[in-house]
Amino acid sequence: MTAQNIDGKLISQTVRSEVAARVKARTQAGLRAPGLAVVLVGEDPASQVYVGSKRKACEEVGFVSKSYDLPATATEDELLTLVDQLNEDPEIDGILVQLPLPAGIDSTQVLERITPEKDVDGFHPYNVGRLAQRMPKLRSCTPKGIITLLDRYNIDLRGKHAVVVGASNIVGRPMTLELLLAGCTTTTCHRFTKDLEGHVRQADVVVVAVGKPNFIPGAWIKKGAVVVDVGINRLESGKLVGDVEYDVAKESASFITPVPGGVGPMTVASLIENTMIACEQFHSK
């Protein structure tokens, strides 16, 4: 058995096309296009690449993309003042502050300052809390993108034992909540977990988000399991690999996300979708 690759590039393009059609319908009806504000502090090269791809995706679907690039010397107060201005801007539906922020700026303070109805990253405690209470509005982009991928491949999650490896606020924790909502029995593994191998070997669905190349040996994957690899790691050779030993894992899995081209494109697609939802549901009065 060789796993079927889950094509994140294809599904993300489908999602973007669907959003573009909704934008076109809005503008043809005389309504404004959705607006996304992207805030970058400092000159971190990886952040610049991510921000560039998000801005490009916005423009492709017909959004109004507004860029705010602050120097690395910007203070927390300056950033909070900008967030306050964007919260009040009637043409901005979504506010994205690119992480990580420079030392000296409290990212929790900044993310909590974004009004929940413009929190298109889905990081605000209000939005995470709504997901926990089975009433999601704006959902964390990467977990939402993963659920979209599994849904588009008609993978039924109800009753499955799902194991999430990694417990970050950005992926692991909201992913656990998403899988719970989808009807899974969920286990979250983290740095204090004993017998990680035992947990992974039992999993019908494995989601790995730890940021360590080939962290999960392919031999741990149960026959027929669905493997979602969130990691993207560059080896010294320049090759990009995930957190799961792909070549071995694909021999046992039924479905697997490749790296690159699996989960990554869906994060941006979910951001686009969240901005559309924010515009339609919260700011079209």
From Swiss-Prot:
One Gene Ontology cellular component annotation held by this UniProt entry: cytosol
PROSITE patterns, per the entry: THF_DHG_CYH_1, THF_DHG_CYH_2
Domain of life: Bacteria
Catalytic activity: (6R)-5,10-methylene-5,6,7,8-tetrahydrofolate + NADP(+) = (6R)-5,10-methenyltetrahydrofolate + NADPH; (6R)-5,10-methenyltetrahydrofolate + H2O = (6R)-10-formyltetrahydrofolate + H(+)
Pathway(s) of this molecule: One-carbon metabolism; tetrahydrofolate interconversion
UniProt key word NADP: yes
EC number(s) from the headed UniProt entry: 1.5.1.5, 3.5.4.9
GO molecular function terms attached to this record: methenyltetrahydrofolate cyclohydrolase activity; methylenetetrahydrofolate dehydrogenase (NADP+) activity
Keyword annotations: Amino-acid biosynthesis, Histidine biosynthesis, Hydrolase, Methionine biosynthesis, Multifunctional enzyme, NADP, One-carbon metabolism, Oxidoreductase, Purine biosynthesis
Function as written in the Swiss-Prot or TrEMBL entry: Catalyzes the oxidation of 5,10-methylenetetrahydrofolate to 5,10-methenyltetrahydrofolate and then the hydrolysis of 5,10-methenyltetrahydrofolate to 10-formyltetrahydrofolate.
Protein name: Bifunctional protein FolD
Organism of derivation: Vibrio atlanticus (strain LGP32) (Vibrio splendidus (strain Mel32))
